[in-house]
Amino acid sequence: IPPRTPGLPQPGQNGDLPVNAYTLIDGKAAAARVLVQVRKDVDSLREQDIQPALAVILVGCDPASQVYVRNKILRAEEVGIRSVEHRLSPDTSTAQLLNLIATLNADRSINGILLQLPLPAHMDELRALEAIAPDKDVDGFHSQNVGGLSQGRTVLAPCTPSGCLYLLEQTCGDLRGKHAVVIGRSNM
């Protein structure tokens, strides 16, 4: 008999699954639902003469990062968000990257900035993330966004944890009083 943890729902209560049961979550179906809603939101913005635009910065030639960036741009364009890609060579200096970020921060036609991580080892990643204007920081990594999130304020939340919560809510319904564990190695 598995041990019981005080305070946690026990298997079989409130329709919970038995100890060894699992639920397969269809992430592709959930993503499709999100894309439909985002497309509606973008269409609504366009009716107000607002064209959402995302600037994506990729420094270096990391193959995994190139795939991530390509997929992000494709999804953005699929829902009507204009994408502007900035590919920088691996030997770009932190100062050059900061200049580009400052230019994008000042560009009123750009609504969001995504800096693809990791950066090459010689670059100051934290300084680059802090240079992105908090209201354009689509990954939610700026310290103002991280701090606001930890205080329960509405901010730009990081995509990965937001996606995890969305999947859990779609699968389990109301999460109040429930416990979930997400295992990962990043600061997201």
Where are each of the predicted segments found?
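Short, well-structured alpha-helical segments in soluble
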Residues: 96-108
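Short beta-strand elements in bilobed, periplasmic/extracellular small-molecule ligand-binding domains
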Residues: 54, 76-90
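Anion-binding alpha/beta catalytic cores of soluble intermediary-metabolism enzymes, centered on
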Residues: 21, 112-180
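Positively charged, low-complexity intrinsically disordered leader regions
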Residues: 19-48
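Short beta-strand segments enriched in small/hydrophobic residues
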Residues: 51-60
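Low-complexity, intrinsically disordered or signal/transmembrane-proximal segments
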Residues: 10-13
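Glycine-rich phosphate/diphosphate-binding loop of Rossmann-like nucleotide-binding domains
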Residues: 59-74, 158-188
